[in-house]
């Protein structure tokens, strides 16, 4: 192993000089071996500047780092623990435990920079993944081994939706999950850990956190650390769920690193390599003939603008998009999923079946018609509408309310127990509303219930 010395430190960017014959490769991990507070700090090589000097990004705080400190080349990229030992543990970007529960005790380590599976290895079968959340199962169904994006501005419920998905899927499908917290709030990471512990699924989840307060290098690489752990489970023949909260912070960390490295920014100040960086991550999240990775990614939408380069680049990689709307959230309807804006490649009669497809289409048509009639109602009132339109409005309002649902993870705040609704019950309920079976039931009865039977029961009680 070659050793070098630190020649320049600018925040998270550290330049290290090595002998000309032993210059580290790009993405190699370097370790600070000199004395002081930074002993053990890991640096990742980003550029070779010539003359034996490499430019690196620090994977931790560079406080106390000074010129002349000795640095050792590890000879490979950052390697993290993988396999069963990671389940139930919280780790940082380097795979070091941060939950004070002793060493990980892993049997194997993988480097975080790996090639995506080749075309021949990839699987092409389609199978639906039931989530138990009515609006998602109906309008934007998830595929096993697919990629799903949860789009939403600040405070419309991305994290709560993601927590509910983890809770439902871990309980109903008893699958393994990897949760990568990329640049999110430490409080949420803490809540998530205790929630998983309380619901008894902690031994099925591996958690990797690179929170908001950490340097950009950590936030940029933590998604790859989580993905590497998920890949190991997939290669063992398991079906894994990879949750990334939040993919926008991954882009943002890339922007910070890019600026620190002195690259010219592109549109809206993003890094010029935005599409390539996103592609490197997304292409690895795929299913092979051995096992599957189903990924759910929360995507923060800056200023609710879906045309911003970051969400727009993410859109291209996804099979299903769940768009959370501030307008729906303001009506008190949670989950605040917009059924007219959310899409899924799986919503095809050949995949979901003709009945499901027709009901989903019917729901969207009724809601779209109601949206068009809203202006007329606002100006002239309900009385000016034809009988058919009055019927459409009445059913649309019932559908809107029936799309809401109490969540298990929100029980603490709402006091109402969470509901898991099987897909067949979801289809039966919406089909009944569309066909006028429940025209006699008041719309309030459909608010915050599980299956349609609960709505009827609620109405009868009144």
Curated annotation (Swiss-Prot):
EC number: 7.1.2.2
Topology in membrane: Peripheral membrane protein
Catalytic reaction(s) noted: ATP + H2O + 4 H(+)(in) = ADP + phosphate + 5 H(+)(out)
UniProt xrefs under CDD domains: ATP-synt_F1_beta_C, ATP-synt_F1_beta_N, F1-ATPase_beta_CD
Entry-linked InterPro entries: AAA+_ATPase, ATP-synt_VA_C, ATP_synth_F1_bsu, ATPase_a/bsu_AS, ATPase_alpha/beta_chains, ATPase_F1/V1/A1_a/bsu_N, ATPase_F1/V1/A1_a/bsu_N_sf, ATPase_F1/V1/A1_a/bsu_nucl-bd
Entries under PROSITE patterns matching the protein: ATPASE_ALPHA_BETA (PS00152)
Cysteine disulfide partners in this protein: none
Binding site for ATP: 152-159
Keywords: ATP synthesis, ATP-binding, Cell inner membrane, Cell membrane, CF(1), Hydrogen ion transport, Ion transport, Membrane, Nucleotide-binding, Translocase, Transport
A Pfam family the protein falls into: ATP-synt_ab
GO MF annotations in UniProt: ATP binding; ATP hydrolysis activity; proton-transporting ATP synthase activity, rotational mechanism
Oligomer status and interactors: F-type ATPases have 2 components, CF(1) - the catalytic core - and CF(0) - the membrane proton channel. CF(1) has five subunits: alpha(3), beta(3), gamma(1), delta(1), epsilon(1). CF(0) has three main subunits: a(1), b(2) and c(9-12). The alpha and beta chains form an alternating ring which encloses part of the gamma chain. CF(1) is attached to CF(0) by a central stalk formed by the gamma and epsilon chains, while a peripheral stalk is formed by the delta and b chains.
Described purpose of this protein according to its UniProt entry: Produces ATP from ADP in the presence of a proton gradient across the membrane. The catalytic sites are hosted primarily by the beta subunits.
Name of the protein this chain belongs to: ATP synthase subunit beta
Species name: Shewanella amazonensis (strain ATCC BAA-1098 / SB2B)
UniProt lineage: Bacteria, Pseudomonadati, Pseudomonadota, Gammaproteobacteria, Alteromonadales
């Amino acid at each position: 192993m070659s050793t070098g010395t630190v020649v320049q430190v600018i925040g998270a960017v550290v330049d290290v000089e090595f002998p000309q014959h032993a210059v580290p490769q790009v993405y190699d991990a370097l370790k600070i071996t000199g004395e002081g507070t930074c002993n053990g700090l890991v640096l990742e090589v980003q550029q070779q500047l010539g003359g034996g000097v490499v430019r690196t990004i620090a994977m931790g705080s560079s406080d106390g780092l000074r010129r002349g400190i000795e640095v050792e080349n590890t000879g490979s990229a950052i390697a993290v623990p993988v396999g069963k030992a990671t389940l139930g543990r919280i780790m940082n970007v380097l795979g070091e435990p941060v939950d004070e529960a002793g060493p990980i005790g892993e049997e194997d380590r993988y480097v975080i920079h790996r090639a995506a599976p080749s075309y021949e290895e990839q699987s092409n079968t389609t199978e639906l993944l039931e989530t138990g959340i009515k609006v998602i199962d109906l309008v934007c169904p998830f595929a096993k081994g697919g990629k799903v994006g949860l789009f939403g501005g600040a405070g419309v419920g991305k994290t709560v939706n993601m927590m509910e998905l983890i809770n439902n899927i871990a309980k109903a499908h008893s699958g393994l999950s990897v949760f990568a917290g990329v640049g999110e709030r430490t409080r949420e990471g803490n809540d998530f850990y205790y929630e998983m512990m309380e619901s008894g699924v902690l031994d099925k989840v591996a958690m990797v956190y690179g929170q908001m307060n950490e340097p950009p290098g950590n936030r940029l690489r933590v998604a790859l650390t989580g993905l590497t752990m998920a890949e190991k489970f997939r290669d063992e023949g398991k079906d894994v769920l990879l949750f990334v909260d939040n993919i926008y912070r991954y882009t943002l960390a890339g922007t910070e690193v890019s600026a620190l490295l002195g690259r010219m920014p592109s549109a809206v100040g993003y890094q010029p390599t935005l599409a390539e960086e996103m592609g490197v991550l997304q292409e690895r999240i795929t299913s092979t003939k051995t096992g599957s990775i189903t990924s759910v990614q929360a995507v923060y939408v800056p200023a609710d603008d879906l045309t911003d380069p970051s969400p727009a680049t993410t859109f291209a990689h996804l099979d299903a998009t769940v768009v959370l709307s501030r307008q729906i959230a303001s009506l008190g309807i949670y989950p605040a999923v917009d059924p007219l804006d959310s899409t899924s490649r799986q919503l095809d009669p050949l995949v979901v079946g003709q009945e499901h497809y027709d009901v989903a289409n019917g729901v969207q048509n009724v809601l779209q018609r109601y949206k068009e009639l809203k202006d007329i109602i606002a100006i002239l009132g309900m009385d000016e509408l034809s009988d058919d339109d009055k019927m459409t409005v009445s059913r649309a309002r019932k559908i809107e309310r029936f799309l809401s649902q109490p969540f298990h993870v929100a029980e603490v705040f709402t006091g109402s127990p969470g509901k898991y609704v099987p897909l067949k019950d979801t289809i039966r309920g919406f089909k009944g509303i569309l066909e006028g079976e429940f025209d006699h039931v008041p719309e309030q009865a459909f608010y915050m219930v599980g299956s349609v039977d609960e709505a009827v029961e609620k109405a009868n009680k009144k």
